Structure formats: structure tokens, C-alpha cells
Amino acid sequence: MNNSVLGSRPIKEKGELENAYEKLLDIEQSRMYEQFYAFLRTTDLPYIPCLENDVEIVYQKCFETLHKLGEVSIPVSVALSMHYYVLASIATYPFKKTSPQYWKREILLNKIKKERVFIANTGSIRTYDNVSENKGILAMKEKDNYIVYGRAPFMSLAGIADYLVFTAELSDGGKAVFFAASDNAQIEFTDTVFGDTMLGSFTKSVKFKNLRVPVSNVIKLDTQTKEQSELLIYQRSWFQALVSAPYLGAAKRVIKEVKGFGEQKMKKGKKLSESEYFLNNLGELVVKYKGARQLCMQAGRALSRFKQGNKVLLEMLFEASVLSKFFGTHHAEEIVTQARYIMGTQFLSPQTMTHKIYKEIVFGPLQPMTDIDIKAYFSQNL
């Protein structure tokens, strides 16, 4: 992606992103990540999907933000990606203006933009064919409300987000997307097993204990056909297309560290950076980085071409997004591992950015869709 493609507010947004980058660098020292999210609310960065109409520009701006912040903190950037993919998928899905979902969406976006809201997501299945198998969160209609109960193992931005957006099974069949305030006694957060490694993401388990959600905050989905729900697949595709950005940002930071190492390291009276062997290894890292990034940009273009009701385009964008996730996260991890071999013990020195990234980069391939799900899908779709 060319950095000049920044939409209608290039100067402001580029300045905001640089400021956010510098702020996050400072926060990394104290690890008071709540302060960073408070700062982020004062910018337009979290609300890009509410402020742009062009789908590809929305994608590019969200990706660039996540990529830049990922150079400093994978956990923080991953958490923001959870906010982005839900917001972007809802904001850009081509609802017909005659549908009630269109107007519910407009009200929701205006609320998010006006109140500077952060949203978190949980409970959505992120594979193509398994929409009906998500039984973790259930909802039952009761007059003008739905009563929601169940549990999801992971949710980022727990305690930071103002609202939760999640998908649940309906007791009478089908699925629906729910929008609920997070400050509610019927929502309980508990710590996950990640410990301090993903501290900045505020990832916790979430339990719904008969949470009452008004029907006005619910978008029902048509999941009765074999194709399942377009909106869920579209939402899933946004997630896959964006989730590599934090990891590729971190990989780029590591490549910069390798270049700096080559300039400083002396071998037989010459800089390491002058050796053909070093340049060959460095070139391989950059090839992997740029190749993965190009796949991500292709996923963004596929999202922009989607038309409601077009199964071929839906499948194409889903596959483009999954491929970008698979190769993006794997290439990022490979870059970091190869950099460790090049830099040796200096790479793992305590309190260095390379050591921090080395501990965080492994989470990329583990995020949905996992390798086993991706390979299972493509084994049936040659």
C-alpha cells in the first residue's frame, strides 16, 4: 500500500498516527496501556470505518494503523484490530436502504462516532462453513428483549471497550448479532492463560449471565440457506484480512533492527552489511515481508469488489482474506526467527524490542482461522 493513499484527511490522520505511535512507545515503558486507549479515543483513528465511504480506503487506513502500532506492540494492535474488523464489516456491508438492518446500522455508526466508543467482539465463528456450530452463546426472545447466556473463552479490550458486539444462536433457530453495553452486572470477565505476554490487549474470558438486550440492538441473520449468512462471512473476511497487520508491522521493525545490526557489526575489518551473505539473508526477509503485505492489499481489493448476493465474489474475498492471514502471520514469524539466527544472542537481550517481539509473534498463526481450519477448508476447495 502506498502511504499517499490516505483518503480525505491525509495530513490530520498521518499526524494522528505518528502521535499515536510516539505515545505507544512511551506507554511501553510504564505498561499503563489504559492511558494509550484513552489517548486513542481523542483521535479519529478508531473511527476510520465511520468516516470513509470507500471500502478499499477503509481497509488501507485500518491496515496502516494496525501495522504502525504493531511495530511497537503486537498485543495493542491486535486488540484494535478486533474493534476495527467488527466496525468495518458493519459499516461497509452493502445493506439495501429498504432493509431495517441498514437503518439500524446507521444509528449504530452515528452513536459510535459521536460518543467515541470502543467496541469489542466475541462469540463469532471465523470459518466459512461452520456458522451453525457456534453453541457457546445462546439467546432467547422475551417480549421486546433477548435474554443472552453462555460463555466465550477470549475477548480483547475487556474493561476498555464500551460496547460488545457478538453473535449468538437463537433458541428458535438462526443467529443474530447483538450490541450491548459492557458495563453490566450480567457480563463477567475473567483472566485468560496468556499472562503478561499479551497484557496490552486486555484479553479475557467473558460470561453472559442472562444479559437482557433490547430488540432494537439486535440484527437477525438469515442462516437458513446452505450459503449461510453473507454478513457473517463478510465480517469473518474482514478479520482475516486485518489480523496480519500487527504481526507484519512487528516483522518490519525486526527487519530494521537487522539492518542496524549489519551496519554496526564488524567482521574482518568490514561492516557485516557489506557482505553478500548478509545482503542475501536481508533480501529474503524483505521478500517475505513484501509478499505477505501484497496478499493483504489484494484482500482489501477483494472486500471492495463484493456485491450482496454474489456468492462467487463472497467466496473469492473470503479466500483472499484467509490466504493473507495464513501467509502474513507465518511469514512474520519466519522473519523474526531468521532474524534471531542473524543477530544471535543480541536478538534475545532482555528489554530489547526484538526479544519482546519474539515472545509475541507466535500468536499470529494461532488466531482464527487456525492452520488446521485453513488447510481443512482448502483441502475441499481446489
Positions of predicted regions on the chain:
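C-terminal helix-coil-helix/basic helical segment that borders enzyme active sites and/or dimer interfaces
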Residues: 22-26, 290-326, 340-348
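A short core secondary-structure module
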Residues: 151-189
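Structured, charged N-terminal subsegments at the starts of enzyme catalytic cores
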Residues: 2-52
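Glycine-rich beta->alpha junctions and the first turn(s) of the following alpha-helix
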Residues: 195-289
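Alpha-helical scaffold segments that form or flank carboxylate-/histidine-based iron centers
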Residues: 238-240, 273-285, 316-327, 355-363
